[in-house]
Each structure stands twice: as C-alpha cells, then as structure tokens.
Amino acid sequence: MDGFSQRTPQQALAALLDRYAPQRLLLIGERFPALEAFAQAHPHVQIAVASPGPLPGELAAQRFDLALLVDCLEHLPKRDGLQLLGGIRNLNASRVAVLADLSACGWQETDFFALALQASEKFQRDAQVLNLFTYDLHEYKQVPDWLNAKFWANPENFGKYWW
C-alpha cells in the first residue's frame, strides 16, 4: 500500500458499509456523511455512538457486526487507544475499521499490524494523510487445507483412541 487511493475517505467508508451491511454498528467518534447516508438507506440498522475513550458499560457488554473508529485515536493517549482498539477487536466486534491520521495520533503502521489489522487504503488531502486499517475475523486466519485427519500419522485411529 504505497500509493494513495483515488477514492475519498468518505467513499471508502461508504463502500465498507455497503460491503459488510452491518445490522449493529458501533461508531467511536463523530458521525460522518457516509454513515448518515447508510443510516437513511437502512433505517433498521442499530447504530451506537461513543466518544473516544473507554467504552461505556452498556456498549462494552454488547456485540456489533462492525466497529468504526473515525477521528478517535488522535484524541487519546496511545496506551488508551491500544486498549480501546484491542478490547473492541477481542470482545465487541468481528470486523473493525479505523481511519486515522498517523502523524496526529503518534501511531505507526506496525502498531496496527500488531493488533492484526491490515492496511487497506491511504488518502491524502493537502498535507494531511489518512490511513484506513481493517480487521475481519472471518478473513484473518484461514484454516490450512493440510489441517485434517488425512495428514495425521495414523488417520485410521482418529477418533478411536485417546491417550
């Protein structure tokens, strides 16, 4: 991901919303035009909004189809941001998307990679560069084709003996 995307961040977020079509959405940060358009087109979607920081108890106890962090990490100390993002990824959502200005939040791409997020797109507007990182549990680790009884030392004994 060396070059900049031809799309705008709003277009990329709109495409993400269309692709995943979440029924329950968690937004950390401020609402944005692409989200408003999605909400109008899909009035049945439940959207929970929280400000940057620790999740309120009622949201922390819920699962969401998609979590979006937009204009969020720039307003948190890095340690708090890591805890928030890791907690959401582990406990609250199977899919996560983060739009961040790395120079404003003090993060590096490797910080996102360490949390198993992938660099999806990079956007530039004047001097500002925004990065979109995504995580999808369903695409994170595919089961290798060799991980089955056919390739075990004694596949005929699979399920027969316990030692």
Q: Which residues does each PLM region occupy?
A:
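Class I (Rossmann-like) S-adenosyl-L-methionine-dependent methyltransferase catalytic domain
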Residues: 1-59, 98-163
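Short secondary-structure boundary/capping elements
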Residues: 8, 79-80
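Structured loop/turn residues at beta-strand edges in well-structured enzyme cores
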Residues: 20, 62, 91
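A short SAM/SAH-binding and catalytic strip from SAM-dependent methyltransferases
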Residues: 64-79
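A structural signal for the main folded, soluble domain(s) of proteins
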Residues: 69, 82-85, 117-118
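A short glycine-rich, Lys/Arg-flanked "PGG" loop and its adjoining helix->strand segment in the class I
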Residues: 80-98
